């Protein structure tokens, strides 16, 4: 494990990435051959082995998921669709500034007279005018590498920083998983001031979720339901007139003391306020994990510490763009 698929525009540096993975991490390269099979599908090669179709390639990779492979150029929509379902696959989009790519393109003797306009037309056709358009690949990619230098060592340093073999890039940790759920819950928020989401967990099982907004039956905050949030009042001010329930309150109310039980963990994409922290301690939450700081963090930390509740900030994996 894993299989890395490389995609990206012409002359972006995919060959250099293959060289890095082969040299530094012992990957086996898989290349697309220029000819097609009788069904019009691409043919692939790894070492001396020729794989005559997408199905052959998938059948070859699946039982070898413990081995390391890099596919240089994903050109088949069917191949990409099949690989994206596999837990051992990582799609990496390699990009570079267009003038850098143009100058690389012209280094091929037979293409030295290509104009920039001609190169842009070739690039646009590949990016926008096919079922396998590059723009779609960019949207689906797990990682984006900007190869903005002609010095190979600079690209290799970026690849090392990207840590392609990090298991969290293939299957998220519990912290990443539940924080993503909290962020998803936040998208349901109707609060005009900020979106906040929360997930309550025990034994790695979700007990309840919550997001902030006006209570059941009331007009949504983003439809004028809370005058305070629809005004220009500052953060942390006039909270006594706010009609919105906080995400943590919603999750705790949904769960109740009996369902919370012992050793529950509360994940919230924003550090709980002091008022929510009081309720968190009362329900016996063991740990609070948050992502973004809030202006009451020190007060929250003091209260939770006094109550024996662990407070921890979640630091997500390194950015997906390098």
From Swiss-Prot:
Q: What is its main location?
A: cytoplasm
Has keyword Cytoplasm? yes
Q: What InterPro entries does this protein's entry cite?
A: APOBEC/CMP_deaminase_Zn-bd (IPR016192), CMP_dCMP_dom (IPR002125), Cytidine_deaminase-like (IPR016193), dCMP_deaminase-rel (IPR015517), Deoxycytidylate_deaminase_dom (IPR035105), P-loop_NTPase (IPR027417)
- Main enzyme class: hydrolase
A cellular component term from Gene Ontology for this protein is: cytosol
Question: What subcellular locations does the record give?
Answer: Cytoplasm; Nucleus
Span of the signal peptide: none
The answer to keyword DNA repair applying to this record is: no
- Cite the EC number: 3.5.4.12
Which family would the database say this protein is a member of?
Answer: Belongs to the cytidine and deoxycytidylate deaminase family.
Q: What is this protein called?
A: Deoxycytidylate deaminase
